[in-house]
Amino acid sequence: MGEKKPEPLDFVKDFQEYLTQQTHHVNMISGSVSGDKEAETLQGAGTDGDQNGLDHPSVEVSLDENSGMLVDGFERTFDGKLKCRYCNYASKGTARLIEHIRIHTGEKPHRCHLCPFASAYERHLEAHMRSHTGEKPYKCELCSFRCSDRSNLSHHRRRKHKMVPIKGTRSSLSSKKMWGVLQKKTSNLGYSRRALINLSPPSMVVQKPDYLNDFTHEIPNIQTDSYEAMAKTTPTGGLPRDPQELMVDNPLNQLSTLAGQLSSLPPENQNPASPDVDACPDEKPFMIQQPSAQAVVSAVSASIPQSSSPTSPEPRPSHSQRNYSPVAGPSSEPSAHTSTPSIGNSQPSTPAPTLPVQDPQLLHHCQHCDVYFADNVLYTVHMGCHGYDSPFQCNVCGCKCKDKYDFACHFARGQHNQH
């Protein structure tokens, strides 16, 4: 019974020696302890350990396993973090700070037993061991590429699939499950966009924009539930695109998907004898612009029936390709304020072979040169080139030209000599 009483005292003594070894190791790294004191302290600690019959764990293992233990000799910042003595790095745990100090000291305790490889980080050694075992746990979700390191997989995604890693809050769903959903969705969608993928679950919900509330109730055979179910339906007549090109959060993508549904509807109130001419002259077209990476603009025109009015129908060109500007007239609706070329009575899968023809009534006309301008700014700049006294006199240099051809050649040469 008398031999068991000193055991608590011996345990406290051994624990104090254990802390002394840790403190001594850190001081040895920082260079604050001389070599003679180091040898004496280590020899004394080893002698006491042999006398007590206890085997103390190594310093390297103890630092990793007891990251929450505070070690004397480290300076703390104002927020309680442990600060590095060589730079401004600070960490809450001791283990991470010790790993950081190895960058300055060059210490590499983690060594490979198959080759001379050594590293200051245990995770680097684990990645190196996969080169010996041939294990490749990281797989690309878009192709059959496999690698042994996460950084190689990120480099492969940026180089092959043009994907940029997105910084933000992590989703509750796993990345593999989200990639499966994105791949399934890209196989159904037919409109291409640049790769802008957000792994948050709310981004998969297609919301109805507020600026569509003004005219969705007036479009025939289009209901609200059909727009809300766009994420589950497959638009007809879509162009086959690369599955990598997917955009979820852009409202323009929602408009283009709605345009695909509008184009799939059969036209109403149309004269079968003359398909190129609108039957009702009071119908106003509605255009939805769809920008793409190839700079190809495609729009879908849907007929919106208006109330009957006693006004006489206005003559329209017989071609199917038209351009509508914001100055279409007082009868234009506020929703059709976007000036985009449209292709009438055609599916989105049919590319436009030629540029749309401008309506002469909607353009700005220079009566001197007989030139039409679709933009008011270009028209104003052009009219400023004509002189005030003579229409074919250059307003820049005062050169008098014979006719409109000589006037155009003068500005094409750009030789404005002041007289």
UniProtKB/Swiss-Prot annotation:
Compositionally biased residues, Polar residues: 262-273, 332-349
Cross-link (Glycyl lysine isopeptide (Lys-Gly) (interchain with G-Cter in SUMO2)): 5, 185
Zinc finger (C2H2-type): 82-104, 110-132, 138-161, 364-386, 392-416
Family annotation (SMART domains): ZnF_C2H2
Listed Gene3D superfamilies: Classic Zinc Finger
Compositional bias per record (Low complexity), positions renumbered to this chain: 297-311
Compartment annotation: Nucleus
Claim: Transcription regulation is one of the keywords in the record: yes
Keywords: DNA-binding, Isopeptide bond, Metal-binding, Nucleus, Repeat, Repressor, Transcription, Transcription regulation, Ubl conjugation, Zinc, Zinc-finger
InterPro entries reported for this sequence: Ikaros_C2H2-ZF, Znf_C2H2_sf, Znf_C2H2_type
Keyword Transcription regulation on entry: yes
Record region (Disordered): 36-55, 262-284, 297-356
Taxonomy, superkingdom: Eukaryota
GO CC terms in record: nucleus; protein-containing complex
GO terms assigned for molecular function: chromatin binding; DNA-binding transcription repressor activity, RNA polymerase II-specific; protein domain specific binding; RNA polymerase II transcription regulatory region sequence-specific DNA binding; zinc ion binding
Comment, domains: The N-terminal zinc fingers are involved in sequence-specific DNA binding and heterotypic associations with other family members. C-terminal zinc fingers mediate homodimerization.
Oligomer status and interactors: Self-associates. Interacts with other family members; IKZF1, IKZF2, IKZF3 and IKZF4.
Family to which the UniProt record says this protein belongs: Belongs to the Ikaros C2H2-type zinc-finger protein family.
Reported function: Transcriptional repressor that binds the core 5'GNNTGTNG-3' DNA consensus sequence. Involved in megakaryocyte differentiation.
Protein name (record): Zinc finger protein Pegasus
Gene responsible for this protein: Ikzf5
